[in-house]
Amino acid sequence: MYAVLKSFGLRGLNGFPVEVEADISGGMPALSIVGLPDSAVRESGDRVHAALKNLGFKWPDRRITINLAPADVRKTGPVYDLPLLLAVLAASGQLETPPKDTAFLGELALDGSLRPVSGVLPMALEAAASGVRALYVPAENAAEAAEAGGSEMQVFPAATARQVVDALRGVQPIPPTAPVPFDPADAWNHVPDFSDVCSQPLARRAMVIAAAGGHNVLLIGAPGTGKSMLARRLPGILPPLSREEAVETTKIYSIAGQMPAGRGLVTARPFRSPHHSASSAALAGGGALFRPGECSLANCGVLFLDELPEFSRESLEVLRQPLEDGCITVSRAAGSATYPSRFQLVAAMNPCKCGYYGHPTRACTCSPSAVRQYRSRVSGPLLDRIDLCVEMDPVAFDELHSVSPSESSAELRRQVLAARAIQAQRYAAPGYEGVHCNAQLTAGQVRRICRMTPAAEQLLRASYETLGLSARAHDRILRVARTVADLAGKRLLDEDSLLEALQYRAQEKVELTF
């Protein structure tokens, strides 16, 4: 006898349909799984066998052949356990073959209970696009899968395979799961507040500019000056995630297996802070299953690299593609996968190896050549992709004990949202597709958008020739100046906007001369 069920697999960031075919024929009792299965899929036969018996069903004592189509695409993971069990039941006559518009996902425990699987949201989105009307998933994945449902597709949560069988037989229907209400603004309540940061007005201003324009930031300062505090508070003044951004971010976290059980969409902008010992593969992603790395996990959020020069040169060079293109391609012998990596980079570093070069009270123990060598670990091409650089001085005692309140995240966020509203209106015009903030402007768009007063243009010309700026640095200065002007509500870039943008140039602050 023969039966076919519908399931889905993962290829990069997207799902693809998989037909689970089961054929039971005469011959010696055996189970064969074909269709390019990996070891986890091949092992599913043993899980299905044990679960089926423990649920009280009969295992067919005949030859069973399972085919996962299309046969030329590799199948990975335990997501096919549930459809395999149902296909065996249908082919052996213990269950009617489910309708063609019904699909199944889920890993089996040996007692027949269902365990959550990774990548449910991209597979559920593909299911809805493929015309599936009913999707059965493990109960812990239901909230995530329901985000792809709506009126066209219902998502049914199940704790055991027995519940799925009873629902298909009409014995005990399963109530469908409704999507969780989307409330990204609530995420602000779980981020530390900027009012905790004492003094550092220049660095605070740089973080506001970064949030308003989507710019990358480098913080340079001795230990204890507040670099990490500022970085961890940046998500609290960023605009809330749009639903489109939330879906994209949730897909990445789901594929990486980092979605908490029972969660719908990710509502908070990610904040990722990998250790400086992280390898290039940890940042870029990879492995046999093409898992996303830290660059992709920080998509639509903040990637914080503390102790920047301590990262290996190979790891830092990985950042160049996502910083420029907003995506990263992971290539292996089995193929390649491209993941979105549109993050804001916030990097922090000490001024030297000992951390006290230029400190007003503590002596630096590094020689000039040691300072130069330490800072040279950050390459020029990477610095050229950082829009804002701030040197942070130690906090004075009086500032630490000042009773004057610092601006809160809510106050800074109002400034950021006002500037983002100006940009949203500006980039709603034709010709700016995919541009949401000033940092995303192309070179051609910079020329059209960043109009200057005559005095500002003369200042930029003098700076370009004196500082020996590259074309990329020229455009980044204009993007920052455009953000400064947006924060001030100015239509044209004036001298003040350009001067503030120029003072944040990273190249000159990192490359010391003695």
Enumerate the predicted regions with their spans.
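Conserved inter-motif catalytic segment of the P-loop NTP-binding fold
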Residues: 245-279, 286-287, 393, 434-444, ...
